[in-house]
């Protein structure tokens, strides 16, 4: 009985000091893009986008979500990417409070 209690205590201590336990509830998983597409995505296939500007990622990127729920990383400096973001912004404006 004493061995199982000690083992349980060690497991709890290990879980408390694991990297996930130390990050706290405010941490959010970071999505990074490691390769960027060079191909222009047709506007009718795009559903939404989000910008990746985290300092934890190797490069800034835009992730487009297609209507088929596929995520595609693109270079935010490219003109077609900027035009696509403007198109999506006009298509679904943010609701006013």
From Swiss-Prot:
Disulfide bonds join 32-57, 33-73. The keyword Disulfide bond applies. Residues 1-23 form the signal peptide. InterPro entries: Chemokine_b/g/d, Chemokine_CC_CS, Chemokine_IL8-like_dom, Interleukin_8-like_sf. It comes from the Eukaryota. Keywords: Chemotaxis, Cytokine, Disulfide bond, Glycoprotein, Inflammatory response, Secreted, Signal. Its main location: secreted. SUPFAM superfamilies: Interleukin 8-like chemokines. Glycans are attached at residue 94. It is found in: Secreted. GO terms for molecular function: CCR chemokine receptor binding; chemokine activity. In response to the presence of allergens, this protein directly promotes the accumulation of eosinophils (a prominent feature of allergic inflammatory reactions), but not lymphocytes, macrophages or neutrophils. Binds to CCR3. Belongs to the intercrine beta (chemokine CC) family. This is Eotaxin. The lineage of its organism: Eukaryota, Metazoa, Chordata, Craniata, Vertebrata.
């Amino acid at each position: 009985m004493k061995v199982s209690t000690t083992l349980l205590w060690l497991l709890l201590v290990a879980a408390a000091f694991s990297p996930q336990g130390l990050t706290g509830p405010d941490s959010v998983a970071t999505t990074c893009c490691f390769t960027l597409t060079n191909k222009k995505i047709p506007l009718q296939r795009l559903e939404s986008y989000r910008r990746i500007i985290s300092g934890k990622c190797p490069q800034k990127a835009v992730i487009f979500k297609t209507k088929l729920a596929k995520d595609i990383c693109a270079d935010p400096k490219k003109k077609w990417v900027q035009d696509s973001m403007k198109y999506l912004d006009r298509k679904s404006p943010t609701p006013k409070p």
